[in-house]
Amino acid sequence: TSTNGASSSNLGGIDAGFSQYGRVVWYLNNLTTDEAIWSYEGGNDIGVRELQRNIWDASNPFFRGMFSRAMLQVALANEFLRQSTPEKLNSRGISTSEQGEIQIYRNEARALRALAYYHLMDFFGKAAFNTENDAVGVAGPQYDRQQLFSFIESELLEILPTLKAPRTNQYGRLDQGFARMLLAKTYLNAEVYIGTPKYTECAAQCTELINSGYT
């Protein structure tokens, strides 16, 4: 979220600590339920009390942090995809072997972009939609949950065969297991997102994961 601590966020107007991806996902998913209780409410984390008492509003810094962080992830993935096309790589003298590895990175970036849109769909129900084909700085159309669901599903299904097999990638990089887990989570709540249950599809992805050798 920054290189020099909470006071140097790469998101304007947002403290880096309030927009750390894993933190805000956990806060919004858990502190808003009875799964976790904050033992003190008078600390420095403004907005925690409102989350766990379900009295938050649009000014809550964790909601702003989550939305902004997810949209930044979309923007970063889009820019990586713009800068790593075969045409750009050829013009920069990148070897054929390196281009093959970069193509895998491109598909991983698409999966991370799908993750960001998943959280926007899940937490907010809508978001501005942009891909690498849109000009930088242009506000995209607002997509609702059904549109975001369709994009996430089609994107993950398209790139799934191109990702590395489960547990074969470098540490810290995603693989087919990531894509299947995100598909499973998307299908699990499909009835909420699009009004159509997809439990069979969810179970199929979970079965693939279970049989992937994880312990």
Q: PLM features: what roles do these ranges have?
A:
Residues T1-E108, L112, Y117-F123, A128-D134, ...:
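Short acidic-aromatic linear motifs embedded in glycine-rich loops, typified by GG[WY][YF]DAGD(H)
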Residues M121-F123, A128, R167, N189-G195:
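Short coil/turn linking the two alpha-helices of tandem helical-hairpin repeats
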Residues E191-V192, A203-T215:
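Polar, glycine-rich mid-to-C-terminal structural blocks
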